[in-house]
């Protein structure tokens, strides 16, 4: 794999940390008001800006595997329909007929054209209105005025990003910044979908996302899963994209120590068994990437601050259908990841209940949790509030401890 040398350097960084008993760190610990998880006004601003005004990573190229493919989702109260036309180009539309706003498609599949199930108006895969049943009833209709509502979309490096309204700017290279060549080497489109699971929990979407952003909890919370293979409280942290709002975390496994006895020239693809690689793509995506499997998490706000939905889609590379990185088949690996997330979401739900009690005024992110600090500062900037304007950053006695 072309990116093997990139990750050899990452391995060497982690080995240095493991030997020294340290981790990549922020300059200091950081206190965040609990209201960022519970305040309805802040929650409404997040939905209106962070989600509606920012491009979203919605799926992989392999979810539209051939000409005529379509893929639908309705994750942010905006029903979206993706198509791949006969030239191979991806389009994004509001999943609504322009006659009377009926939904055009459900799920995913393949089709030669789009026909409205309500009154049989017909559109091509580029969103052009081509047929009106009983057209004489509409007089001299100008079909060009009834093309599907187009949404911005870009496909690159095997990923598809889209905007939830027509004015959103989508530039994959701008989103990924200097990490774009690394994602290009991963070629996430060369994958096969395995399975999907959804969680709907009584917790804030950011609380659920927090668990992807530090390894400090591995040994305590995941004793029977990740804790059995991981080196806790150690990670290599890097930022990328606009204002460094995205990040990559590499968590070493205990097995990484074996590489100290093996010459670097002999390191091969099996080094990817020695660490876990997690990417956060603003505002709500966590990607666990390896040469064998990709775990794609999308986290969405619910109807109020204390509700959220996590969508987990698991993929394997088309050339590695038999075994996952942990030696299991793809379905068994999918079920293992679901078990890990179950352990985390239980904690997120009880934390939310405690925060709603109104007596824990701050959450504290240690210096050993730089990704959490970086991500939450980005969220504040995203709603027009800089961290310097909020009562954050000074560490003292935590309320109610």
Predicted ranges, named:
Residues 1-96, 100-107, 152-155:
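N-terminal pre-ligand scaffold of iron-sulfur
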């Amino acid at each position: 794999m072309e990116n093997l040398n990139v990750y050899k350097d990452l391995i060497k960084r982690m080995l240095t940390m493991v030997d020294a008993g340290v981790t990549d760190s922020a300059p200091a610990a950081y206190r965040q008001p609990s209201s960022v998880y519970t305040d309805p006004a802040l929650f409404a601003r997040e939905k209106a800006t962070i989600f509606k005004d920012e491009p979203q990573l919605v799926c992989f190229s392999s979810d539209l595997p051939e000409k005529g493919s379509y893929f639908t989702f309705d994750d942010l109260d905006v029903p979206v329909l993706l198509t791949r036309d006969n030239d191979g180009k991806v389009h994004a539309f509001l999943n609504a007929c322009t006659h009377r706003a009926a939904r055009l498609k459900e799920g995913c599949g393949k089709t030669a054209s789009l026909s409205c199930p309500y009154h049989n108006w017909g559109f091509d895969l580029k969103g052009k209105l081509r047929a009106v049943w009983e057209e004489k009833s509409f007089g001299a209709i100008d079909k060009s005025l009834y093309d599907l509502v187009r949404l911005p979309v870009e496909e690159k490096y095997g990923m598809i990003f889209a905007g939830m309204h027509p004015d959103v700017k989508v530039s994959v290279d701008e989103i990924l910044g200097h990490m774009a060549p690394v994602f290009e080497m991963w070629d996430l489109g060369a994958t096969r979908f395995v399975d999907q699971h959804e969680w709907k929990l009584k917790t804030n979407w950011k609380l659920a996302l927090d668990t992807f952003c530090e390894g400090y909890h591995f040994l305590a919370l995941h004793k029977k899963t990740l804790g059995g293979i991981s080196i806790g409280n150690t990670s290599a942290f890097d930022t990328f994209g606009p204002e460094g709002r995205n990040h990559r975390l590499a968590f070493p496994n205990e097995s990484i120590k074996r590489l100290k006895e093996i010459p670097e020239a002999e390191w091969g693809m099996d080094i990817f068994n020695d660490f876990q690689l997690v990417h956060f793509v603003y505002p709500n995506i966590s990607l666990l990437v390896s040469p064998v499997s990709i775990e794609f998490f999308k986290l969405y706000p619910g109807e109020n601050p204390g509700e959220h939905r996590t969508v987990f889609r698991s993929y394997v590379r088309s050339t590695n259908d038999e075994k996952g990185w942990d030696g299991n088949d793809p379905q068994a690996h999918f079920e293992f990841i679901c078990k890990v997330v179950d352990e985390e979401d239980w904690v997120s739900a009880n934390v939310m209940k405690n925060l709603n009690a109104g007596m824990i005024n701050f959450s504290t992110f240690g210096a050993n949790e730089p990704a959490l600090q970086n991500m939450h500062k980005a969220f504040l900037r995203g709603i027009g509030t800089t961290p310097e304007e909020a009562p954050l950053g000074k560490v003292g006695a935590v309320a109610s401890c």
